[in-house]
Amino acid sequence: MTKPIEFYFDFASPYSYLAHKQIRRIEEKENIKINYKPIFLGGLHKLIGITAAAFINSKAKFMIRDCKMVSKKLNIKFKFNPLFPINSLNLMRGLLSINSNIKDSYIDFFFNAYWQDGLNLNDEKVIFDILKQCKVKKNDFLKKIKDQKIKDKLKKLT
């Protein structure tokens, strides 16, 4: 029996986005399913006591150049978001709180909004518009992201 492949990711990470696009291609081509596991990258950085590359000028410049190069090589539509980095905590919690039948569209919509369309995912109105496209009720989302079980689950995954 084959073990499932798990992909740990955060919407705030450009490398997660690029990997996500490749994963979708592989899933389609090979007819397999990858299990997406949300983490909170900001919390992980804090936990291990490192400063994210986004906050170190030389590393940030390299990351931007690297992501553009990789996206071009792999023919992935990509725009480095000038609002990088975002606080993705509520988006990651939200993924853990929605029905499994809409998780794929939720993931695709939020990744594309941030890394293709350059939208501001720190803006609640933008988030609510995307939730509507995903058929997630705003009030349910707002309630569930505050649920301690959801918070604990994300901490555990991180």
Can you say where each PLM-predicted feature lies in the sequence?
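Short pre-active-site segment immediately N-terminal to redox-active cysteine/selenocysteine motifs
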Residues: F11-A12
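Structural alpha/beta surface segment adjacent to cysteine/selenocysteine redox centers
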Residues: Y17-D117
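C-terminal cap of thioredoxin/glutaredoxin-like
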Residues: M1-E6, Y15-K33, S100-S105, F109-T158
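Short amphipathic alpha-helical segments at helix-loop
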Residues: Y8, I48-A52, L142
